[in-house]
Amino acid sequence: MNKIKEGANVRITIYSPEVYTYGAMLIGGILKHKGYNVHLVRKIDKTLFLKSDVIIFSLYSTLHILDKNIREAIDFIKKVRKNKTKVYVAGCVSTYPEIILNELNVDGVIVGEGEITTPKIIEGDKEGLAYKEGDEIVINYPKEKPDLNHPLPLIPKDIEQQSIRGANVYIETHRGCLGNCTFCQVPKFFGKTIRSRDVEDVVEEVKAFKRAGAKRIAISGGTGSLYAFKKSINRDKFFELLEKVSEVIGKNNLSVPDMRVDYVDEEILEAIKNYTIGWVFYGIESGSDKILKDMKKGTNREKNLDAIKLAKDCGVKVAGSFIVAYPTETEMDYLLTKDFIVDAELDDVFVSIAEPIPTTELCDLVLSMPKEENLLYKMHEGEYRKLGLSEAEARCFDLLIHAEMWKSMPKPLTPQLYNLYLNEARIQGKDIRAITDLLFKYRDLLLKK
């Protein structure tokens, strides 16, 4: 691999589709700290691409691999710049480099966490890089995981215009997850050991984002209360983190939304009430204990309801995320989820059709069953049959409408809201079918992993 010229003479562009992800900003900051000329964009900019020596496509969804605009941009760069511009893919999609290298005309895939390896790869090293050598695919996995001490991220000038669930940015406080959820990639990508940043480093970063114009900040590492976790929850460190960040940005501009029901208690919820906007987002997923067991959630219906009640008793608002059309979900399981929503009276609800992400158990399950048994490919024959929905789309649509009626503050189901939810279900179905079709193309490869 040819070594690229060094330092400020090297023009690097990082492209993060639609959203400036934290990972893209982080790698941008590390490369800038090393003296490189770095641009971070969230829209395809062919003029900038043609002036770049290195372009990193920081992708966070399997859907990006299929994105026509991304494919065309990569082909355009390779056609015009030949070998003058190196094109890499990075991000959480890097756990399946074989698919990327077969689908996209790129020089390589930066595998896993890229803080240590990305600067080395730009200098010509191959550690942490997957690439094609003739007809063979070579995958060099990183030798070590980075600690989380790093320079400030590269913060875009228009960061205040970005909104991710109401926040301008999600700042990472820790990595890793103790869970075993079958649909989640986090333990595979970041590991099961919790690695946490120093409170002071997080605070300095929040100050930098505030100076750059960010008004609303969320902090997360998958499950907020696992910050500084060793053998048990470190409440003192978690409270210190919330208090100090809140002092900088203000409690009405800080959220720590992502929580597991088995890692909250009254003290943690009181801290969330006192130092943040006062919301938690629980990944509830299903009202069926059988499905929760199939998903390896480590919780059940009763624990979920108890955690919701506890939060409400503490004056904290609760949003719940649900997954429909999990491969083993029956009609009865789905009805139990509807019953759960009635009992829970959540303040907000998010509904997703089960998405197979490569390297997860859910992906293996989807690829191991005939497509015609997948609810994404079965036509709905019930009350919405005139809408031409798959069974998965119908459950998504139905649950969105049902949840709206049973929220703590329900909205009337206007034609506009009806069409909004119908469109949401259709888009999810279309996208996840496209992903599933792609994964079936690599079925044998993925089931071997």
From Swiss-Prot:
Cofactor(s) needed by this chain: [4Fe-4S] cluster
Cytoplasm listed as a keyword: no
Co-factor binding details: Binds 1 [4Fe-4S] cluster. The cluster is coordinated with 3 cysteines and an exchangeable S-adenosyl-L-methionine.
Positions of [4Fe-4S] cluster binding: 177, 181, 184
InterPro entries associated with the record: CHP04014_B12-bd/rSAM, Elp3/MiaA/NifB-like_rSAM, Methylthiotransferase_CS, rSAM, rSAM_horseshoe, Tetrapyrrole_Bchl_Biosynth_MTs
Enzyme Commission (EC) number: 2.-.-.-
Keyword terms: 4Fe-4S, Iron, Iron-sulfur, Metal-binding, S-adenosyl-L-methionine, Transferase
Enzyme class: transferase
Protein's name in the database: Putative methylthiotransferase MJ0865
Source organism (scientific name): Methanocaldococcus jannaschii (strain ATCC 43067 / DSM 2661 / JAL-1 / JCM 10045 / NBRC 100440)
